[in-house]
Amino acid sequence: MALNVVILAAGKGTRMRSDLPKVLHPIAHKSMVQHVIDTAHNVGSDAIQLVYGYGGEKLQSVLGEQQLNWVLQAEQLGTGHAVAQANSNIADDDTVLILYGDVPLIQASTLEALLAAREENGLAILTVNLPNPTGYGRIVREANKVVGIIEQKDANAEQLAINEINTGIMAAPGKQLKAWLGQLSSNNAQGEYYLTDIVAMAHRDGVAITTAQPDSAIEVEGANNRVQLAQLERAYQARAAEKLMLEGANLRDPARIDIRGEVSVGMDVMIDVNVIMQGKVTIGNNVTIGAGAILIDCEISDNAEIKPYSIVESAKVGAEASAGPFARLRPGAELKRDAHIGNFVEMKKAVLGEGSKAGHLAYIGDAQIGSGVNIGAGTITCNYDGANKHLTVIEDNVFVGSDTQLVAPVTIGKGATLGAGSTITKDVAADELVITRVKQRHLTGWPRPVKLKK
């Protein structure tokens, strides 16, 4: 028996006031529908049917490389009609799990509970109790057993008083589902084919109907406009922040942090306000992350410090190392143990060795730098000749004076000293002192320029 997931993603989302299909709007830097697809994989889906309509080309350009069966709903005639478009991809013995592309916070654990609640060849529906159920379909019970779902516009006064509502998420047996979908009618206030009508059909046919509920109602809330999208974003961030704190992070203010990927932290990590973490970020023990830092696809080792307003992207920061404030580690950069870069230092595709330092105002690109090296302010590795990149090698215990340019390819030997203001175009041997600046001249009585009168 296969788990066949149908994700409804055909809506335009008019209230978003956007050319982008609604389900492509992001939560935590990932489209809503991608969150749902990932959750479907997490519950062990054997196949995913993505029912699309408006903006199909944009959807396929974003999601096209994934293992999905694309099912077109040419006309938007209701949720029942949408699911029916996938009938040819549903086997009789499938368990069909129906999800929604604009409900991104649904948890795998909730769906697992729903599937567990379903009896053999039965129908399981996910419900939730709301203090204000206005706008939602109500769960109709008799003797505590579900007998149907009534939509808001079709409900009478007694039914409108029901607080248990339909989330739309359900698990159904493939054979019966296809039969029920074929019996749907659009004879209702909306003139649509309601998926919810299959619940009454299941009751009629004597099929066991069971229910499950999520831990929080926010899991089943959708986003129809940008206000609701922002509310879901905040809910996602609150949940992600809570997870970090339970793992051992101290968050200066959990409401002022953005987590946009897979973040893992060690013990006693301190994270200040307005930090953004994106992609896969791994943080060791006793790490300090300063205010406004941005971490993207990076590794921060034990006892390291990322000072305020620094950016670490696709880079590694070793144990005891530090970066910032206002430092930038670009892809391929690595700080070894106890290395340091200070304010306005940029590194790309370069390694700064153990205990080495670049305190301020430097660019280090395509470079291999040994241990115990001092990089003076204003140092530049000139790595690009207009066509190709070249490597700079600086061996252990080198002292590079301020405002030095190293024109790659070039190698500086161990213990060498480069005088301030030098432009190095040739290799330097170990323990040499090299100075290339012009000899200082003194011109007495030099007349300074005078501004012309207008």
UniProtKB/Swiss-Prot annotation:
Residue sites binding acetyl-CoA per the record: 377, 383-384, 402, 420, 437
Source organism, top-level taxon: Bacteria
Recorded GO CC terms: cytoplasm; membrane
Binding site for UDP-N-acetyl-alpha-D-glucosamine: 8-11, 22, 73, 78-79, 100-102, 137, 151, 166, 224, 330, 348, 363, 374
Ranges for region N-acetyltransferase: 248-454
Reactions the enzyme catalyzes: alpha-D-glucosamine 1-phosphate + acetyl-CoA = N-acetyl-alpha-D-glucosamine 1-phosphate + CoA + H(+); N-acetyl-alpha-D-glucosamine 1-phosphate + UTP + H(+) = UDP-N-acetyl-alpha-D-glucosamine + diphosphate
Annotated active site: 360
Binding locations of Mg(2+): 102, 224
Region (Linker): 227-247
InterPro entries attached to this UniProt entry: Bifunctional_GlmU (IPR005882), GlmU-like (IPR050065), GlmU_C_LbH (IPR038009), Hexapep (IPR001451), Hexapep_transf_CS (IPR018357), MobA-like_NTP_Trfase (IPR025877), Nucleotide-diphossugar_trans (IPR029044), Trimer_LpxA-like_sf (IPR011004)
Required cofactor(s): Mg(2+)
Chain intervals for the UniProt region annotation (Pyrophosphorylase): 1-226
Pathway note: Nucleotide-sugar biosynthesis; UDP-N-acetyl-alpha-D-glucosamine biosynthesis; N-acetyl-alpha-D-glucosamine 1-phosphate from alpha-D-glucosamine 6-phosphate (route II): step 2/2; Nucleotide-sugar biosynthesis; UDP-N-acetyl-alpha-D-glucosamine biosynthesis; UDP-N-acetyl-alpha-D-glucosamine from N-acetyl-alpha-D-glucosamine 1-phosphate: step 1/1; Bacterial outer membrane biogenesis; LPS lipid A biosynthesis
Cellular localization per UniProt: Cytoplasm
EC numbers for this chain: 2.7.7.23, 2.3.1.157
NCBIfam families: glmU (TIGR01173), PRK09451.1 (NF006986)
Family stated for the protein in its record: In the N-terminal section; belongs to the N-acetylglucosamine-1-phosphate uridyltransferase family.
Assembly and interaction partners: Homotrimer.
Function, in words: Catalyzes the last two sequential reactions in the de novo biosynthetic pathway for UDP-N-acetylglucosamine (UDP-GlcNAc). The C-terminal domain catalyzes the transfer of acetyl group from acetyl coenzyme A to glucosamine-1-phosphate (GlcN-1-P) to produce N-acetylglucosamine-1-phosphate (GlcNAc-1-P), which is converted into UDP-GlcNAc by the transfer of uridine 5-monophosphate (from uridine 5-triphosphate), a reaction catalyzed by the N-terminal domain.
UniProt protein name: Bifunctional protein GlmU
Annotated source species: Shewanella woodyi (strain ATCC 51908 / MS32)
